[in-house]
A protein has these predicted regions:
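Beta-propeller blade signature
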Residues: 9, 53-59, 180-195, 233
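Conserved small/polar residues in nucleotide/adenosyl-binding loops
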Residues: 2-3
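Structural signature of eukaryotic scaffold interfaces centered on beta-propeller domains
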Residues: 32-40, 82-105, 150-161, 210-214
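Short loop/turn segments immediately following beta-strands, especially the blade-tip
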Residues: 10-17, 114-131, 232-233
Length: 233
């Protein structure tokens, strides 16, 4: 819950029984956008931190920060990290063992693979295929980074399993197709060492997806005027 700054646990069985009281696993004090638990009793955070992109928080390590948002050159590096991060928002997804995760950016073809240990985050791979065009607006009290409508949307969603990473790719711009730019027909599958495995070309654009633990089935939300749940196996 971003507004309450809480990470809560939702039990589907209890929800079906009408119980909507969710236990709080962690209360975030860092203004994170997303939080994922790790197998080491710590929490990985993604946010517009002052100088960094990720945080790692736990009783035995406190709060530590890692890496910064991408930049194409020295000039873009001078843009404040919190402001630059608004142009490089994306999807964070971890494997079931909670010791590896992927961060894929929506506004540009950039993704990174990471591993988590007891007190550190290590980047194992990064792919950079381009950078977004955007403006920066910072009044001191408000900040934003409006994007160019000509930007080609890249990795709309990411999903991770024990063996593989999956990236949903758009390749379209808002200028060309409007909000359909936030859907994609291509899913790239790669191993955690970044070895390409497969490229799935779907028959119709999808807006979101997940993959079975055995990696043999893809479930997707398809927008055909009405949203449909589809299965690929």
């Amino acid at each position: 819950d971003v507004y309450k700054r809480n990470l809560v646990e939702m039990n589907l069985r209890q929800i079906k029984q009408g119980n909507i009281q969710f236990p709080v696993l962690m209360q975030d004090t860092l203004m994170s956008l997303n939080i994922c638990p790790t197998q080491y009793d710590t929490y990985l955070g993604l946010g517009f931190y002052e100088n960094n992109m990720f945080s790692l928080t736990g009783k035995h390590i406190g709060s530590r920060y890692y890496y910064e948002y991408p930049y194409r050159d020295k000039q873009e590096k001078e843009v404040k990290n919190r402001l630059r991060g608004m142009a490089y928002q994306g999807t964070l997804s971890s494997n079931k063992s909670l010791n590896r995760f992927v961060f894929a950016i929506g506004s540009a073809p950039i993704f990174s693979l990471y591993s988590v240990n007891k007190d550190n985050i290590d980047k194992s791979f990064e792919f950079v295929g381009g950078y977004p065009e955007y403006k920066t607006e910072d009044t001191g009290t408000t900040r934003s980074a409006p994007m160019s409508v000509a930007n080609k949307m890249a990795f709309i969603k990411a999903y991770a399993t024990e063996k593989y990473v999956y990236l949903l790719y758009s390749g379209n711009s808002y200028k060309e197709v409007g909000v359909k730019a936030f859907n994609g027909k291509i899913i790239y599958q790669l191993a955690w060492d970044a070895t390409p495995i497969c490229k799935f070309v779907l028959d119709f654009p999808i807006m979101n997806f997940c993959v079975s633990d055995s990696d043999d089935t893809i479930y997707a939300l398809m927008d055909k005027e009405e949203v449909e749940l589809v299965k690929y196996s």
